Curated annotation (Swiss-Prot):
Catalyzed chemical reaction(s): (2R)-3-phosphoglycerate + ATP = (2R)-3-phospho-glyceroyl phosphate + ADP
Main location: cytoplasm
GO biological process, one term: gluconeogenesis
Cellular localization per UniProt: Cytoplasm
Taxonomic lineage from the root: Bacteria, Bacillati, Cyanobacteriota, Cyanophyceae, Synechococcales
Residues the record lists as binding ATP: K206, G297, E328, G357, G358, D359, S360
GO cellular component, one term: cytosol
EC numbers for this chain: 2.7.2.3
Residues the record lists as binding substrate: D24, F25, N26, R40, H63, F64, G65, R66, R122, R155
PANTHER family in alphabetical order: PHOSPHOGLYCERATE KINASE, PHOSPHOGLYCERATE KINASE 1, CHLOROPLASTIC-RELATED
CDD domains: Phosphoglycerate_kinase
Protein name per Swiss-Prot or TrEMBL: Phosphoglycerate kinase
Gene this chain is encoded by: pgk
Family to which the UniProt record says this protein belongs: Belongs to the phosphoglycerate kinase family.
Length: 401
């Protein structure tokens, strides 16, 4: 179901209106409390600037970390307000609490185009419980609602779902709209051939996604630590590589399902092994049927890279979720980097390349190729759930188009 978005609202609709905007500002900090990556803050700028330009009074709501429903001084949004103020080139007022007299006073003092950042909503346990009274208090600060926090859209919380019952209009922000357009579009109406590259260490965390993708894709390429569960299910020796013993039957079923549907399910043909889980471990590259005892696979090998590149060459849409190996160790990053480079090249030839959140995003950024991709998702769990075909509560709650 298509949703109304900020694009549908004019300056006349928004001028002098108090607009509550749920954003995803859950950014990483270093030990000194400085932001180490402001990507999520920058991702919300198009929505915030659009509202400022249309004369709205912008009230931002966000969570930070997991304070478990109580005030945690290390999880205040102070560094976020400072960085946002620098990026916008204007003052951002932060409240002491997300509801209550201080928030009300600061919101009441706003002029058109002003920006207020409410303190961490998760300082209240009612946020994650989606408590109606708490949602009503948040909503009482505003006249309209915009959800731009795709990364939190899979949660039915007070600030993502509850507030929509009290605010009309409730619409998607520009980032949310773009996420839905790309991710939903790739699943519902992709340019074909459609390929998915699924990596990461565990089959268990990607079961739903793998099952859904085998239903939708023409090709599914699997890398990362989860490949060893598939190999063991085939009866191969995997040394001391990571295996989920309770998922061996499932691995067999997934391979059988792909075969029955005529979907090309590709696993690596060679792997880079290490004698220890360490950056400077001894390494060797072997065929998957020649993994010796005492060694563990930490990356896909050069033959597998060629196999995957050939399979992707004619694809018109590619979704990538999860690295091919332990890319944090330079010695075992070749597979992941090769996929990143391949997708960047495909983008240049008109292929729609979607990096579906999580570690793949970090890998693409580490390789300096983020700008070359069609779309980089800001959601981890939300991206996975959308690709699985699940309804995201934060999206479902918005006004229908």
């Amino acid at each position: 179901m298509a949703k109304r978005s900020l694009s549908n609202l004019s300056a006349a609709d928004l001028r002098s209106k108090r607009v509550l905007v749920r954003v995803d500002f859950n950014v990483p900090l270093n030990e000194n409390g400085a932001i180490t990556d402001d990507t999520r803050i920058r991702a919300a700028l198009p929505t915030i600037n659009d509202l400022i330009d249309k004369g709205a009074r912008v009230i931002l709501s966000a969570h930070f970390g997991r304070p478990k429903g109580q005030i945690n001084e290390g999880m205040r949004l102070t560094p976020v307000a400072k960085r946002l103020s620098e990026l916008l080139g204007k003052n951002v007022t932060k409240t002491e609490s997300c509801v209550g007299s201080d928030a009300e006073a600061k919101v009441n003092a706003m002029a058109d185009g002003d920006v207020v950042l409410l303190e961490n909503v998760r300082f209240f346990s009612e946020e994650e419980k989606n408590d109606a009274n708490f949602a009503q208090k948040l909503a009482a600060l505003a006249d309209a609602y915009v959800n731009d926090a795709f990364g939190a859209a899979h949660r039915a919380h007070a600030s993502t779902e509850g507030v929509t019952k009290f605010l009309n209009p409730s619409v998607a922000g520009h980032l949310m709209e773009k996420e839905l357009q790309y991710l939903q579009g790739a699943i519902d109406d992709p340019k074909r051939p459609l390929a998915a590259i699924v990596g990461g260490s565990k089959v268990s965390s990607k079961i739903g996604v793998l099952e859904a993708l085998i239903d939708k894709c023409d090709k599914v390429l699997i890398g990362g630590g989860m490949i060893f569960t598939f190999y063991k299910a085939r009866g191969l020796s995997v040394g001391k590589s990571l295996v989920e013993e309770d998922k061996l039957e499932l691995a067999k079923e997934l391979e059988a399902k792909a075969k029955a549907k005529g979907v090309q399910l590709l696993l690596p043909t060679d792997v880079v092994l290490a004698d220890d889980f360490a950056p400077a471990a001894n390494s060797q590259t072997v065929s998957i049927d020649a993994i010796p005892d005492g060694w563990m696979g930490l990356d896909i090998g050069p033959d597998s890279i060629n196999l995957f590149q050939d399979a992707l060459a004619d694809c018109q849409t590619v979704i990538w979720n999860g690295p091919m190996g332990v890319f944090e160790f330079d010695k075992f990053a070749a597979g992941t980097n090769a996929i990143a480079t391949t997708l960047a090249d495909l983008s240049g030839k008109g292929c729609c390349t979607i990096i579906g959140g999580g570690d793949s995003v970090a890998a693409v950024e580490k390789a300096g190729l983020a700008e070359k991709m069609s779309h980089i998702s800001t959601g981890g769990g939300a991206s996975l759930e959308l690709l699985e075909g699940k309804v995201l509560p934060g999206v479902a709650a918005l006004d229908d188009a």
